[in-house]
Every structure is written in C-alpha cells, then in structure tokens.
Amino acid sequence: MKTITKISLTLVLAALLCLTFCCCANKEPEKPRPLFDEDGLYLEENFIFNAALEKDGAHLVENEKTEYCIRYEETTDESVLTAIEELRGYFSAVCGGIEVKTGAGEGKAIRVGKYGYVPSTPLVKTGAYIIEVGENDILIYAENVFGLTNGIYGFMEDYLGCIFLDHETTYIPPVKSMILAKSTDVQEPAFESRTVGDNEAGNYKSFEQKLRVREDETFLTDGCHHSLNMIPKDILAQHKEYYAFIDGARRTGNYLGQGPQLCFSNEEVINLLEEAVVNKEKNKTTDQTVWWDISQQDSMNYCECEKCSALIAESGGNAAAPIFRCVNIIAKRHPELKLSTLAYHYGSSPPENIEFEDNVMIKWCIMSSYGTNDYSAPLTDGATKIAKQQYAEIMGWPELTDHIFVWDYITNYFNYLLPFPCLDAMPGNIRLLRDRGVEGVFSLNAFNNRGSWDRLKVNFASHLLWNPDLNETEFINRFLTVYFGKDAAPYIIRMYRKIHDNTCAPLWVYDFSFYHKIDYLSEMQMDVYYGLLDSAVEACGGDETYLKRLRYERMCLLYASIDLGYGTEEELASMKEEFSRLCAEFSITKLNELGTNTVVEFCR
C-alpha cells in the first residue's frame, strides 16, 4: 500500500512539473505597453515598465545599479564636457552615480567619440551622429563636437526618456532598470542649420545645445538689416545720392514712418558694400563658413530712381531686384565668398529674369508686405489668399537657387503674452520647407522676454527642425504631462486644444487682441479657459512646481482679459493687480518685441 502511495505521489509531482514546464514554455513574453492612453495622456509608468522589458540588449541600469562607466576621447571642448556632466547627472538620479573616464579601456561603457568606428554610410550633415547599442558597449559617434553634443543629448531624450524643460530643469523618468535593445541609429537632422530665437535658449547656450539647435553648429548667417552700417557714416554724409530716391527726393532719414534705404543700383554703393564684405571675410575669427549679408533695412521704403525702377520692372515688379542684382555682382566678382540676401516684405516673391550665383543664399521670410500672414494652419492648407501666395513663393524660390534659409515666426510680437495658437501650423510648415530643399531655418519665438507657451514652443520647434515627421500630438501631450503633472495636464491639453479649435484665420504675428474678440478670445471662450485652468490648479495637489507653471498660464489669460476689458471696473482693477504681481514673479517688465508696452503702463 505504501509503495502504491509513493508511486502515486511521484506521478502527481511529475505531472505538476510537466504542467508547470509546459505553461512556462508556452507563456508569451510580455509586450511593451502603450505610452499614451486613449485621451493622449503620457503614461510614465508604462515607460518605466518598458524600460526593463528588453532581455538581450545593454543592461545599462538594473535594480538601481549600473556596471557601466562613461568613457570619452580626450577633448577640451567645453560643450562636450558639459553634455557628459549632464549624462552623469542622469545616472546620479536613477542609480546613485557613474564613473567617468577618458580614453579606451575594458569593461562595459558608454563611449563618446570615434573609438575607431567606421560608419557603413558616411554622415552628411555637420551635427549628425550615430548611436550604436551593443551588449556591453554603447557608442555615441560623430565627426565633430557638434555631433557629439547632439548625440549625448539625443541619447538622453530618445533612449533614456529625458526632457529638457528649461536651462536648469531636466525631467528624468524614475526608472529602476534601463535595458536597451541592440541597434544602430543614424541621426541626420532635416536641416543643416537650425536656430530658435528664444529668450531661454538665447540666454543659456547650454540649453540651446540640449535642444540640438546650437547656432554655431554649421554655417553662420551674418544677421540682416545692416547694409547702411557697412558704409562709413562720413562717406554717407558726403553722398546723398547713395540713399534711396523716394517720392521725388533722396531720403537720408525716416520717411513716412519708415527708415532710410540705400540705392542699390548705384555702382559706388555696390563697390563700397563689396569692400565691406571682403574685409569681413578677411577679419573673421571663426573657421566656419559665414554667409555675409547684404539686404534691405527693416523698412518698407525702397528706391524709385530711374535705374532701380527699370530693374524692378524687368523683374516683374519685385522691389528688391536692385538688391538682388547688387549681391549677384559682388558674388560673381568673389566666388570665394558666401553672400546672403533677404526675400522679405516687398522682396518675398521670386523675381523674373534673375539668375542667382551659386554662392548666394536667399533668406526667405514668412512675412509679406501684401497683407496679414496666417499662422492658424500650415501654408499647404491655403486657409487665406496670402497663405496661398506664400505657398507659391516657397514653391518658386528653389527654382532660382539651391541655397535657401527661412525665417519663421511662432509668437505675437505686439503681444508676447497673448496666447498664440500656432502649434497646428508649425509641423506642416516645417515639413514643407524640408521638402523644398531648404538648408536652414530660424524659428523666432519671444526672444527678448518671455511669451505665452514659450517653454513648449521652443522645445517643439527645435525637435521639428531635427525631425519634421515626429508625432506632434504625442510630443506636445508628453511635454505638457511632464510640465504640469499627470493630474493637471489633461485640463491644460484640453485648454490648448480649445484655443486652437476656436481660432479663425488669419492669425498674424502682429495681431491685436480685439482681432480675435469673436473667435478664440471671446469672453465666453475665455471663461471656459479659466474654468479648465482652475480645474488644473485643483488637480495638481498643491505641488508648488506645477502651481508656479499654472500661474504663468493664468498670467497669459489675464493679459488677454485686461487688454479686451472683460469685467467690471472693480474686476479689471483686481485682475491688473494680480497680473502685475505675476509679472514680478516671472521677472517680466516688457510685453512686446520693441519694449514699448511695459507692465506698469499696461496696468494703469
């Protein structure tokens, strides 16, 4: 009987083991979880889960520990060393730290540099990089320091899940493990030159570098609107004929509220400008290519002398034709130079009967002289007559030149704090520019003070300039979730969406608030925005970091309400007091590009 019992128990145990083995063998491996819920909200917990899911790759962090070090080829470049310190900071946050060493060496490492690596396909653009993940090594490879800094910050964003919120705040997901799949990732930016004119990025170059839009990365542009300054004042004073002929006279000062221009058909003016750019090239202190600029002043005036008028007529009516001819002449005389000129205001349309030299770059601006531009939708939508005309311009310019640089605009320059809902337009416009072969883009945000949605916009613009095909909804929602917290973010996302949906074309960079009093800035809609913002404040649970960012959002809404006079005299007085207090908290004193509207004046 005992023998039978033992045999029975043995059979039962064998069956259980077999069943367990079969279950384990048939069990499917866990799959990555979605990073966004059905409402588009970013799910940090799923990122953390997915970070530990891979089995066969580089076990960078396991259970809050790392066996890796950071190795880099010796360099004295401060930007690379700063980026390495930022990467070290990531490991300090998630696993207590990591060793940083120079040169080659054994053991698991994140290697920053060439380290004998030969790419199968050469990198094309200056800031490009490769990230290769192996079992024991992660290589961040580039041909130059610009690519290395891009590679380090790109690795932190795209692999480690970081977000650079501002110059001093980096979001780091609180992972316990980070396992990366083996891969080779070649990263080429969409544009050779990428610049974002933004208050935060401009004041803190390290932040600009984190966003991979450092101005010194590729070719440099020589600004614009300074041709008058290229000719010595004492010479200009002796030669009135060097100035533009307007309404029957040479105008040496302001005329009709606009500044003076040169007469670009004057041969002596051309010679003086030639001398100036030759000297600039001779005396430059950088090894980088500089496109020296000869352009109109920031004025709507242009020369109407007999010679200039004839050139304008020959070009089909483009009032910048004398400037284009001037630049072409100098470019032909000096093929060793790179010259640029604006296609701006009255010169934005492609001219007829002009062929540009190979060493001339056109700097086209999404800013016309023939009416109100529209930033409520991409140019491809053709939401307004002017949008259709501008679309035709960017389709036409690549037929005349291989070198195009574009100035884009992403804020309201008359009213920095007024919500400016251009997020729907930005991706489509950037893709269009990429598809037309544009070499560089300058996205100009609120650059000399803070503006509405500025932290999101500088991030969004920078990433679009690197990859115009990114999922814009996911990018925006992830940023807002991290920036305002997962509990408050749904209300801010809804508020931003409502503002966009309520906006009627045209949306212009020089709009006054009353232009939109019947659409997105109506009193009824403003009440909806305040309600959503109040819900966000209530939802964030008293977290002061999030509350401060929500106060900034409220300040922007208050600006619109005060400007439009929404409320009784007592209510407006209360709003002005609150607005003034918030401006002081965020160190805001001026409310527009020129600084002519101060907080004190606005709140009187």
What name fits each language-model region?
Residues M1-R33:
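Gram-positive cell-envelope targeting signals
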